[in-house]
């Protein structure tokens, strides 16, 4: 028994890498309690300079029974008592979760990890107590969903979290080995009563399926972890092999060439599409969604405006390229009659916060990266509007163009046109931010001028 505990500590130290500042996600359960105790043992026994803190989320899940809140209070009291006894600084963050379109556990997990990310200090990494049983459950759930190698890779030992990292240093330990360690060291922990609820798939696997599998095949957990690691290796290899071509198929704006994809086999094309979407942090689409993306969006007629909704994202086609963006931000045009008056001081930097997550405009007499325009006269009212109409004559063009024709010639996608800020002096259009300056907005030599810059959110 001592040999197992010692081995666990040695492996734990190896899995921590070169980091020495840790924030432990501490729930008071077996996994996080053993993790915290193990860290303290490594620090004290090996005289290591480890900086250890703990964080506990005191959760209130809306639409849950009242006794659940009482359990949460009991867990908080236990965590505070344990950290006080071990002299570990504990940060407690209250969180309230209401599921919207997600299951309550998924919604809570999203909020929880955002809290963890915000709590991390400089050079600090987050540690969670996930173990081999958790990894096996993750792989089995991915198998149930029909996932490919990416999903079957399970949870990585290390992954990015905000500006830092998340480490799972106990992934190579079974829950049974953690329990033996806790019993040997006389460690107390709290069992989460929610873990007995078979309504959740993980609990069903944990309580009914894994015991059968490990009873029949004692090394099933280790074998599953090995398979997950092999799947992860294959995904890493594919990333390396396809990264150069994916880079070649992307424009500077991050759009993806349909013509380039069409030259690939279906298998390679799907792999490239998955990596493109993953690079944009989009939830991985199903095989059917990828097929629809190619047939209904990429191969649609040139005059059509098809799109595929993928969670909160939209994928659209324009001029032989695929575009991706959050639909909550870019799918809805700003009202054409919408107008914002801009208080303006010609001699200083002027800023205006735009509506609907569009960022802000800056206009300054000092040299900047923006468009050069003539300065407004004292009697001119400055405003920002949306929705270009009529004929417009812009710099660099001899003849005026109708707004629709002009947008087409400039290569502006249809869904972006009514979200581009238009700068007016009185009723005169001066510029479309980042796109063009009209002839009436020209900054002539020797006359006052300023610089217009659009800082997007």
UniProtKB/Swiss-Prot annotation:
It is found in: Cytoplasm. GO terms for molecular function: ATP binding; tRNA(Ile)-lysidine synthase activity. InterPro entries: Lysidine-tRNA-synth_C, Rossmann-like_a/b/a_fold, TilS/TtcA_N, tRNA_Ile_lys_synt, tRNA_Ile_lys_synt_N, tRNA_Ile_lys_synt_subst-bd. GO terms for biological process: tRNA modification. It is an enzyme of class 6 (ligase). ATP binds at residues 27-32. It catalyses: cytidine(34) in tRNA(Ile2) + L-lysine + ATP = lysidine(34) in tRNA(Ile2) + AMP + diphosphate + H(+). One of its GO terms (cellular component) is cytoplasm. Pfam families: ATP_bind_3 (PF01171), TilS (PF09179), TilS_C (PF11734). Transmembrane segments: none annotated. The keyword Nucleotidyltransferase does not apply. Its EC number is 6.3.4.19. The keyword Repeat does not apply. Keywords: ATP-binding, Cytoplasm, Ligase, Nucleotide-binding, tRNA processing. Ligates lysine onto the cytidine present at position 34 of the AUA codon-specific tRNA(Ile) that contains the anticodon CAU, in an ATP-dependent manner. Cytidine is converted to lysidine, thus changing the amino acid specificity of the tRNA from methionine to isoleucine. Belongs to the tRNA(Ile)-lysidine synthase family. HAMAP family: tRNA_Ile_lys_synt. The N-terminal region contains the highly conserved SGGXDS motif, predicted to be a P-loop motif involved in ATP binding. This is tRNA(Ile)-lysidine synthase. It comes from Hamiltonella defensa subsp. Acyrthosiphon pisum (strain 5AT). The lineage of its organism: Bacteria, Pseudomonadati, Pseudomonadota, Gammaproteobacteria, Enterobacterales.
């Amino acid at each position: 028994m001592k040999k197992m505990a010692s081995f666990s500590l040695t492996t734990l130290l190896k899995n921590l890498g070169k980091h020495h500042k840790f924030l432990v996600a501490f729930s008071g359960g077996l996994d996080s309690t053993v993790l915290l105790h193990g860290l303290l043992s490594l620090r004290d026994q090996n005289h290591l300079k480890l900086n250890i803190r703990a964080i506990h989320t005191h959760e209130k899940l809306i639409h849950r029974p009242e006794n659940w809140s009482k359990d949460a209070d009991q867990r908080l009291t236990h965590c505070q008592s344990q950290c006080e006894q071990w002299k570990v600084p504990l940060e407690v963050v209250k969180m309230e979760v209401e599921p919207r379109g997600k299951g309550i556990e998924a919604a809570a997990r999203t909020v929880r990890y955002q809290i963890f990310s915000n709590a991390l200090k400089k050079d600090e990494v987050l540690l969670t107590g996930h173990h081999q049983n958790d990894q096996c459950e993750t792989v089995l759930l991915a198998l149930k969903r029909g996932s490919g190698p990416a999903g079957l890779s399970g949870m990585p030992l290390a992954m990015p979290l905000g500006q830092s990292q998340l480490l799972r240093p106990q992934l190579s330990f079974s829950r049974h080995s953690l329990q033996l360690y806790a019993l040997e060291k006389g460690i107390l922990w709290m069992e989460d009563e929610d873990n007995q609820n078979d309504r959740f798939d993980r609990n069903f696997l944990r309580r009914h399926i894994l015991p059968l599998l490990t009873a029949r095949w004692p090394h099933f957990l280790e074998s599953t972890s090995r398979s997950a690691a092999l799947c992860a290796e294959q995904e890493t290899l594919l990333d390396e092999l396809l990264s150069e071509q994916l880079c070649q198929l992307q424009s500077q704006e991050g759009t993806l060439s349909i013509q380039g994809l069409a030259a690939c086999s279906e298998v390679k094309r799907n792999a490239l599409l998955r990596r493109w979407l993953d690079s944009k942090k989009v939830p991985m689409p199903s095989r059917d969604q990828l097929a629809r993306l190619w047939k209904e969006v990429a191969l649609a007629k040139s005059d059509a405006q098809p799109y595929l909704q993928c969670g909160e994202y939209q994928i659209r086609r324009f001029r032989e390229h695929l575009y991706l963006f959050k639909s909550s931000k870019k799918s809805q045009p700003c009202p054409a009659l919408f107008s914002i008056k801009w208080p303006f001081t010609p001699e200083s930097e002027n800023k205006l916060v735009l509506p609907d997550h569009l960022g802000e405009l800056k206009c300054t007499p000092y040299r900047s990266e923006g468009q050069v325009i003539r300065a407004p006269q004292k009697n001119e009212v400055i405003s920002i509007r949306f929705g270009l109409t009529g004929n417009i004559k812009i710099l660099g063009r001899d003849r005026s163009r109708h707004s629709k024709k002009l947008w087409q010639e400039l290569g502006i996608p249809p869904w972006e046109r009514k979200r581009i800020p238009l700068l007016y002096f009185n009723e005169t259009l001066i510029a479309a931010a980042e796109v063009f300056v009209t002839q009436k907005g020209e900054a002539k030599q020797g006359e006052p001028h300023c610089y217009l810059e659009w800082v997007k959110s």
